[in-house]
Design a protein with these regions (language model features):
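Single-stranded RNA-binding regions, centering on S1/OB-family and related RNA-binding modules
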Residues: 542-708
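Short, ordered loop/turn segments at secondary-structure junctions
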Residues: 39-41, 130, 239, 321, ...
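Duplex nucleic acid-engaging cores and interfaces of nucleic-acid transaction enzymes
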Residues: 51-54, 61, 65-75, 79-318, ...
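A glycine-rich phosphate-binding loop feature that marks nucleotide/adenosyl-phosphate handling sites
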Residues: 179-186, 319-323, 377-382, 401-408, ...
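Generic start-of-chain signal for non-secretory N-termini
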Residues: 1-21, 28
Length: 708
């Protein structure tokens, strides 16, 4: 069975069976995807995280299908209906749709019309009709008039019910209808009468009709959401006449009275049973595909957001702006610890501007502030301009930071545990400041669904969404690596091999014993075994470690290789890291062994060139157009700076400094065909856009991307 799985996965993913086998062995041994991708390239043949995850997913699907087959076989055996041919078909089938079609005639059912007819003894009459030789079926039906069967027509009706069920369970019949759906199905949506005003936001779908295969994921998810809210009636249908004709060609073999009875049963089978069954199947399939597309978009956006450029370890002032309630100001040290908080009121209706300036100046000097993070919510533009009009004694950079999800964090258990003595306003301002310092470390504390970069994220399969988002966060955290001495337990949770309990144990050990000076000390952490150490060590950094390799992505299992390189050059490891001239003298082929190949050696040398490098780029300052404050300030043709805030499969939403974001439709991203917006833009990218149209009633702004 395992070898069969390897063959099927290999055919699906175009990856060799050997690579698949080795990868599955590593996963079974408890290795994580980031660890395998980074430190086991020789074993897997250099597979990346996406390929490893695909292997894992395919293997899990096949396992689930194998369990389903076992259940089906047991059920049919219990009925005493298993035959060698049927067993062979089940054994050879690895398509879930075909498998369920095979099982359908044996599947336990509720009391159907066909079952009622069988109980009335009408199955022989149904068999007679299907032979289509009897010239006078009405007369033969009279023999069945007894008990609950009132007359010959009642008997024929029961027989037709049996035939209809047989037709609906026939594999070829189902495939005929399925083929028609796949080729020509049209999805139709209509507004529910009397719900027009309530459904106004779905007005694009009030009279909607489109081939299902051309319906985009965002259209499908919007339609299904409106249907769930009781605002739209939705159906999926092929050409009904063509389907019935094809079915009749299969089942109606005689142009006589029996043939007419069978034709009537076929029509009933299609309308009452087959069409609705296959429609449900295609509704589920199209929803699943739309979910996968929406999740893919969400994952891409989340990855870009998590890997946004950090300001780094600087002393930051965070401001959660507001008008009437004032601006909450916090001051943090370079490690993100809260030093001070207070309110200022520089805006209407309070207008304590002079006092606000004085307070800001004093806090900057008292806490040696190097940068200011302003939340991008209410009063953001006014607060940013207020700060930029001030003259500080030293140069202070002002950044506008997304507040999305900050309120969720400030009311969460994580925030309460971090700041039990402070209210939500302080916690929110701290989160804004920390997002500037290190977006990844702060955003992992927030449910990704609250960050605001998804597309219908509440409508998609929540289990699949959570799995994909968790994998994305894990991938990003391990790609960047974390400082073992400053990382929160929540950030450490995502490190390969750790999880919540070990992460908390590390934080507790750090609190009791002081900062880690060596990766080896991890083995003293309660419940840290050899396997967990192997999985996590390479992703944890210690900036002031005794061994400089402890602040790199070089795994401890490879330290001996670097030490040998240094020894061969007559220098220390620290000198080797410091000198490019020395590193250029290294011939990696000298260090090849049965367990260490060229991929690992290349990674080691790359890491020695830039030890502990951060894959995230440098942070950039951005300014909105000062003349645009509300949607009413916009006009067609206006060119504006903006920041890409969200990407969907139909375009990109751009923050232009007002309450409403503008949409750059897919067709307006470039002067050529674009199938994926991610080819052109990324989250947080600074862009220039042209206003195409403004709908103030619906609060919609259409933009065009201006190529640089």
């Amino acid at each position: 069975m395992i070898q069969l799985f390897h063959r099927m996965i290999s055919a699906t993913l175009s990856i060799s069976e050997k690579q698949i086998g080795h990868t599955l062995d590593l996963l079974a041994d408890g290795a994580t995807i980031p660890f395998i991708s980074r430190y086991r390239k020789e074993v897997t043949g250099g597979l990346d995280e996406v390929q490893i995850e695909a292997i894992k997913t395919q293997y899990e699907k096949l396992n689930e299908l194998a369990k389903r087959k076992e259940t089906i076989v047991n059920t049919i055996n219990e009925q005493g209906k298993m035959t060698p041919e049927l067993q062979k078909r089940i054994d050879e089938t690895w398509d879930s749709t075909i498998l369920e079609d095979i099982y359908l005639p044996y599947k336990p059912k509720r009391r159907t019309r066909a079952e009622v007819a069988r109980q009335k003894g009408l199955e022989p009459l149904a068999t007679l009709l299907m032979l289509q030789r009897e010239p006078n079926p009405e007369k033969r039906a009279e023999a069945y008039v007894k008990g609950e069967v009132k007359d010959a027509e009642d008997a024929l009706k029961g027989a037709r019910d049996i035939i209809a069920e047989q037709v609906s369970e026939d594999e070829q019949a189902r495939n005929t209808v399925r083929f028609a759906f796949s080729r020509q199905a049209v999805i139709t949506a209509k507004v529910v009468k009397g719900k027009e005003s309530e459904a106004d936001k779905y007005r694009d779908y009030f009279e909607f009709s489109k081939p299902l295969k051309k319906c985009t994921s965002h259209q499908l998810l919007a339609i299904r959401r409106a249907e769930a809210e009781g605002l739209l009636k939705v159906s999926i249908s092929p050409d009904d006449e063509e389907c019935v004709e094809r079915l009749e060609r299969r089942f109606v073999r005689s142009n006589n009275a029996c043939g007419e009875q069978v034709a009537e049963a076929v029509q009933d089978a299609y309308k009452r049973l087959l069409k609705s069954s296959i429609e449900t199947e295609f509704a589920a399939q199209s929803k699943e595909q739309a979910d996968e597309e929406a999740i893919r978009v969400f994952v891409q956006n989340l990855r870009q957001l998590l890997l946004a450029s950090p300001l780094g370890q600087k002393r930051v002032m965070g401001i959660d702006p507001g008008f009437r309630t004032g601006c909450k100001v916090v001051c943090l040290d370079a490690q993100g610890n809260l030093l001070h908080n207070e309110n200022i009121y520089p805006h209407a209706p309070v207008y304590k501007t002079t006092e606000a300036v004085s307070k800001i100046q004093k806090m900057i000097e008292a806490y040696h502030i190097e940068a200011i993070a302003v939340g991008n919510g209410t009063a953001s533009r006014e607060t940013e301009e207020f700060l930029k009009h001030q003259t500080f004694r030293q140069e202070i950079q002002v950044f506008v930071v997304s507040e999305q999800g900050a309120s969720i964090y400030s009311a969460s258990k994580i925030a309460r545990d971090e700041f039990p003595e402070y209210d939500v306003t302080v916690r929110g301002a701290v989160s804004i400041a920390r997002r500037l310092m290190d977006p990844l470390a702060e955003l992992v504390k927030i449910d990704p669904k609250s960050i605001g970069v998804g597309q219908y994220q509440h409508d998609v399969d929540q289990t699949k969404l959570k799995k994909s988002l968790d994998l994305t966060v894990e991938s990003c955290v391990n790609l960047v690596g974390v400082n073992l001495n400053t990382a929160s337990s929540h950030l450490l949770t995502y490190i390969s091999g750790l999880g919540p309990q070990l992460a908390q144990n590390i934080v507790n050990y750090r609190a009791e014993n002081g900062a880690f000076t060596s990766r080896k000390q991890l083995m003293k952490v309660p419940r840290m075994g050899a396997k967990a150490f192997e999985q996590c060590a390479g992703f944890l950094r210690i900036p002031q470690a005794k061994n400089p390799l402890d602040n790199t992505a070089v795994h401890p299992e490879s330290y001996c290789i670097v030490e040998q390189m240094a020894k061969d050059l007559g220098c220390s490891v620290a000198e080797l890291i410091a000198s490019k001239e020395l590193r250029l003298k290294i011939n990696p082929e000298r260090y090849l062994s049965p367990t260490v190949g060229m991929p690992t050696l290349k990674d080691i040398l790359q890491e020695l060139d830039k030890p502990g490098r951060d894959p995230r780029g440098p942070i950039k300052i951005f300014e909105f157009d000062k003349n645009v404050r509300t949607i009413n300030d916009l006009h067609e043709g206006m060119e504006l700076p903006g920041i890409v805030g969200n990407i969907t499969n139909f375009g990109a939403f751009v923050d232009i400094g007002i309450k409403e974001n503008g949409l750059v439709h897919l067709s307006q991203l470039a002067d050529r065909f674009v199938s994926d917006p991610n080819e052109i833009v990324s989250i947080h990218q600074h862009v220039r856009v042209r206003v195409l149209s403004v709908d103030t009633d619906r609060k919609r702004i259409a933009l065009k991307l201006i190529s640089e």
